[in-house]
């Protein structure tokens, strides 16, 4: 899966938060609370994690053409 490695705005590394964030939100926790507990304070970093859509599942449906 392609995950956000860094914040697109400020450049802060975010990859270490992705798995825990995703699993806790899918488990029913409030994303705001999860981000606060992970220590993600900047709104640009929060936006990057909240808005990420795992598009790899859509992309891999297509065959590679050379």
Swiss-Prot record:
One of its GO terms (biological process) is DNA-templated transcription. It catalyses: RNA(n) + a ribonucleoside 5'-triphosphate = RNA(n+1) + diphosphate. Zn(2+) binds at residues 7, 10, 44-45. It is found in: Cytoplasm. Its main location: cytoplasm. GO terms for cellular component: cytoplasm; DNA-directed RNA polymerase complex. Keywords: Cytoplasm, DNA-directed RNA polymerase, Metal-binding, Nucleotidyltransferase, Transcription, Transferase, Zinc. PROSITE patterns: RNA_POL_N_8KD. It comes from the Archaea. Pfam families: RNA_pol_N (PF01194). Its EC number is 2.7.7.6. InterPro entries: RNA_pol_su_RPB10, RNA_pol_suN_Zn-BS, RPABC5/Rpb10. Transmembrane segments: none annotated. The keyword Zinc applies. It is an enzyme of class 2 (transferase). One of its GO terms (molecular function) is DNA-directed RNA polymerase activity. Binds 1 zinc ion. The keyword Transferase applies. Its cofactor is Zn(2+). HAMAP family: RNApol_arch_Rpo10. DNA-dependent RNA polymerase (RNAP) catalyzes the transcription of DNA into RNA using the four ribonucleoside triphosphates as substrates. Belongs to the archaeal Rpo10/eukaryotic RPB10 RNA polymerase subunit family. Part of the RNA polymerase complex. NCBIfam families: PRK04016.1 (NF003089). This is DNA-directed RNA polymerase subunit Rpo10. The gene is rpo10.
